[in-house]
């Protein structure tokens, strides 16, 4: 019986060696990937503005008629769906604001970007998955990209300041230059790049305003500069580019006699509420005081024809939103164009999002071009939850558990890009293991035990 014991000892040594568990390929043989998000770019923003660079990208690559974001259609939740492939109830970033119903702490959007425990709550985004499989990743202003996940930070990251000017076109180009250097000088494989427009302009002036149209022209010029930069850095044949967004935008209805105002509802009082998250577009959450859930629900369920109020367990499953411990016992949203006012009226935006993701004004864009994508292809609409699986395929990495389906977007790719290399498992760079670090000690212990038993038998 010494022969099997020797073989198992060799297997144990192999498992402990660097790169065990994965076929080997040389560094640099996989195409790189750049995911760009222009916040709040509604699906039809290119239809009332001349956008020659976005049009050229569609001719050279793939265009979706539109993309359906996750619900709730907010910036951070929808961006995290893109990089995890999970619906919001499953990845847990349920709001732009960090909140705690026990301490009553609520933090605004920019502060929440740096709250590690808000983001790192069980889901592993694509940056970390890529790095664990031997790649190098970067995040430039992308929501969630500057905190650690299970103790791992993104290779390179930048976070904007609280008073950041999202409109500065000169800075946009400088940011692109930095990202190109990350690819060429630091050999990053994946970068996510975020721009805060046309969302800010849409909020301030409204989606039908001339200011929004001018901002879309700026976005288009930036797309042109980006593609020129890719060519100038000799990346055209080895970098796949995806341009998308988190959600759309709609015009806010400000008619004084038709507002959704909690402080004017006759049978409702904030004295029954332990915690509230209101005055954030069309969405709201309430934690009633103990024993007052039914009273609050009865007061609100028919309080306004444009307001939809649900107990958590009755919230429509199609939204894939409410089944998360961070969601309060009562939650609500309003119809398209209506925002929810709480104790006083503090919302004055002309444009807003956060509405039902089935509303066309919440739909957004998807464009892709590069060596893996077909040219001149327009595809039918799809959900943003599928983009993660596509990106993992483009990078040649094994995805985490997710809610997307790779088959949904495979028709975008050339046949050779749609299939695993030679039908074999995903290849990893030299010196890295496909086995998660947490699983290797268990395998080692199992093999050691087998070796000892066989030695005793012998």
From Swiss-Prot:
Transmembrane regions listed in the UniProt entry: 434-454
Tissues expressing this chain: Detected in the colon (at protein level). Expressed in the duodenum, jejunum and liver and at low levels in the ileum. Expression was very low in the esophagus, stomach and colon.
Binding site for Zn(2+) 2: 199, 203, 353
Active-site residues (renumbered): 75
Activity regulation: Inhibited in a dose dependent manner by ATP, imidazole, orthovanadate and zinc ion. Not inhibited by ADP, AMP and EDTA.
Effect on the protein of changing residue 109 to L: Decreased enzyme activity with sphingomyelin and para-nitrophenylphosphorylcholine
PTM summary: N-glycosylated; required for activity and transport to the plasma membrane.
Record topological domains on the Cytoplasmic side: 455-458
Residues glycosylated per entry: 100, 121, 146, 168, 267
Binding site for Zn(2+) 1: 39, 75, 246-247
Location within or outside the cell: Cell membrane
Recorded superkingdom: Eukaryota
Note: Decreased levels of alkaline sphingomyelin phosphodiesterase may be associated with colon cancer.
Official protein name in the record: Ectonucleotide pyrophosphatase/phosphodiesterase family member 7
Native organism: Homo sapiens (Human)
């Amino acid at each position: 019986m010494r022969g099997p014991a020797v073989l198992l000892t060799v297997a144990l040594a192999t498992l402990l060696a660097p790169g065990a568990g994965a076929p080997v390929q040389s560094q640099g043989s996989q195409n790189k990937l750049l995911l760009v998000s222009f916040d709040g770019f509604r699906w039809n923003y290119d239809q009332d503005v001349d956008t020659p660079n976005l049009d050229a990208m569609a001719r050279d690559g793939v265009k979706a008629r539109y993309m359906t974001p996750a619900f709730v259609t907010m910036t951070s939740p929808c961006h995290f769906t893109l990089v995890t492939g999970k619906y919001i109830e499953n990845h847990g970033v349920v709001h732009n604001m960090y909140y705690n119903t026990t301490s009553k702490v609520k933090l605004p959007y920019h502060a929440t970007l740096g709250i590690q425990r808000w983001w790192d709550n069980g889901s592993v985004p694509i940056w970390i998955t890529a790095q664990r499989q031997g790649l190098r990743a970067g995040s430039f202003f992308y929501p969630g990209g500057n905190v650690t996940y299970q103790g791992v930070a993104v290779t390179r990251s930048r976070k904007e300041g609280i008073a950041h000017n999202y409109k500065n076109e000169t800075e946009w180009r400088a940011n692109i230059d930095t990202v190109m250097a990350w690819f060429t000088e630091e050999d990053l494989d994946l970068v996510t790049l975020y721009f805060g427009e046309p969302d800010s302009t849409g909020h301030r002036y409204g989606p039908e305003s001339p200011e929004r149209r001018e901002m879309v022209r700026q976005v288009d010029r930036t797309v042109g500069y980006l593609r020129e930069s890719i060519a100038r850095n000799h990346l055209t044949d080895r970098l796949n580019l995806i341009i998308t967004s988190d959600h759309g935008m709609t015009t806010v209805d400000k008619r004084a006699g038709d507002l959704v105002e909690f402080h004017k509802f006759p049978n409702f009082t904030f004295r029954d509420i332990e915690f509230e998250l209101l005055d954030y577009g069309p969405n709201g959450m309430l934690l009633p005081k103990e024993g007052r859930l039914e009273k609050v629900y009865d007061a609100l369920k028919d309080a306004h024809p444009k307001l939809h109020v649900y107990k958590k367990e009755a919230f429509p499953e199609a939204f894939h939103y409410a089944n998360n411990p961070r969601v309060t016992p009562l939650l609500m949203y309003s119809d398209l164009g209506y925002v929810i006012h709480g104790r006083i009226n503090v919302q004055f935006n002309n444009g807003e999002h956060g509405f039902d993701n089935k509303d066309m004004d919440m739909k957004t864009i998807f464009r892709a071009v590069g060596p893996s994508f077909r040219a001149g292809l327009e595809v039918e609409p799809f959900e943003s939850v599928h983009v993660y699986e596509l990106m993992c395929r483009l990078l040649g990495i094994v995805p985490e558990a997710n809610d997307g389906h790779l088959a949904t977007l495979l028709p975008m790719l050339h046949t050779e890009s749609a299939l695993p290399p030679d039908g074999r498992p995903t290849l990893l760079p030299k010196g890295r293991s496909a086995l998660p670090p947490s699983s290797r000690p268990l395998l080692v212990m199992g093999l050691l035990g087998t070796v000892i038993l066989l030695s005793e038998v012998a």
